[in-house]
């Protein structure tokens, strides 16, 4: 009789699904924490918003946080720790009670110190505006280049005018070369000759007295 060995059955390896779920839960919790502002900021806002001179008590502070949508019951321990840390830093002053139980008020020195850096930022913003306006200066230099280009045109005009004057100068030379008038001067002796010929005309005038004498003789005959 042949004996048959029993077949070895291999069990499947267990799939670890639980660690992946834990990671997703942790990531979701981290996202929830990151969405809201820290407790210290919420406490400082609530204390600064209150108008009570004696400070804000713990129950009044919890009411203000609950009105802002903060879960006070789950984060009760965080509120107390936040109050203690703010008092130790000096941002809050505890007017009544000890520890987390009591009334709290904003420190005026810290509030004024926070306001000063804001004023510095505004001054820096004003200083940045002139830096933005400085690139406009190169545009003015481009305008200056245009004026430099125009100046050669002005230099050309006087040169052209000088050429015109030179061209006109030959006319003056022609006017100076009018010695033709000197040639007319020999005509003047002719006028002298005409004056010399006038005594010839005076000879007939001497005959006039003779005619008068003839008239007198005729009158005597009558």
UniProtKB/Swiss-Prot annotation:
PROSITE patterns: H15 (PS51504). GO terms for biological process: chromatin organization; chromosome condensation; establishment of protein localization to chromatin; muscle organ development; negative regulation of DNA recombination; negative regulation of transcription by RNA polymerase II; nucleosome assembly; protein stabilization. The keyword Phosphoprotein applies. Residues 1-55, 94-222 are annotated as: Disordered. GO terms for molecular function: chromatin DNA binding; DNA binding; double-stranded DNA binding; histone deacetylase binding; nucleosomal DNA binding; structural constituent of chromatin. Disulfide bonds: none annotated. The C-terminal domain is required for high-affinity binding to chromatin. The lineage of its organism: Eukaryota, Metazoa, Chordata, Craniata, Vertebrata. The modification N-acetylserine is found at residue 2. It comes from Rattus norvegicus (Rat). Belongs to the histone H1/H5 family. The modification N6-acetyllysine is found at residues 17, 45, 74, 164. Histone H1 protein binds to linker DNA between nucleosomes forming the macromolecular structure known as the chromatin fiber. Histones H1 are necessary for the condensation of nucleosome chains into higher-order structured fibers. Also acts as a regulator of individual gene transcription through chromatin remodeling, nucleosome spacing and DNA methylation. GO terms for cellular component: chromatin; euchromatin; heterochromatin; nucleosome; nucleus. Residues 1-16 have a biased composition (Low complexity). Keywords: Acetylation, Chromosome, Citrullination, DNA-binding, Hydroxylation, Methylation, Nucleus, Phosphoprotein. The modification N6-(beta-hydroxybutyryl)lysine is found at residues 33, 51, 63, 84, 89, 105. The keyword S-adenosyl-L-methionine does not apply. Residues 35-108 form the H15 domain. InterPro entries: H1/H5, Histone_H1/H5_H15, WH-like_DNA-bd_sf, WH_DNA-bd_sf. Interacts with MSX1. H1 histones are progressively phosphorylated during the cell cycle, becoming maximally phosphorylated during late G2 phase and M phase, and being dephosphorylated sharply thereafter. This is Histone H1.5. The modification Citrulline is found at residue 53.
């Amino acid at each position: 009789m042949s004996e048959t060995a029993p077949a070895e059955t291999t069990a499947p390896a267990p799939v670890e699904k639980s660690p992946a779920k834990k990671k997703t839960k942790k990531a979701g919790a981290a996202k929830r924490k990151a969405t809201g502002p820290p407790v210290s900021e919420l406490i400082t806002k609530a204390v600064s918003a209150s108008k009570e001179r004696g400070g804000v008590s713990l129950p009044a502070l919890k009411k203000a946080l609950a009105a802002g949508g903060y879960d006070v019951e789950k984060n009760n321990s965080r509120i107390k720790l936040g109050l203690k840390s703010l008092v130790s830093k000096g941002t809050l002053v505890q007017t009544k009670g000890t520890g987390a139980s009591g009334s709290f008020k904003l420190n005026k020195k810290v509030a004024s110190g926070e306001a000063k850096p804001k004023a510095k930022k505004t001054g820096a913003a004003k200083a940045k505006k002139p830096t933005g306006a400085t690139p406009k200066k190169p545009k003015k230099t481009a305008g200056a280049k245009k004026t430099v280009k125009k100046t050669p045109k002005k230099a050309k005009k006087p040169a052209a005018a000088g050429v015109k004057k030179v061209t006109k100068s030959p006319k003056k030379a022609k006017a100076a070369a009018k010695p033709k008038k000197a040639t007319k001067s020999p005509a003047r002796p002719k006028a002298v000759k005409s004056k010399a010929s006038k005594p010839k005309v005076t000879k007939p005038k001497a005959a006039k007295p003779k005619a008068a004498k003839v008239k007198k003789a005729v009158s005597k005959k009558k």
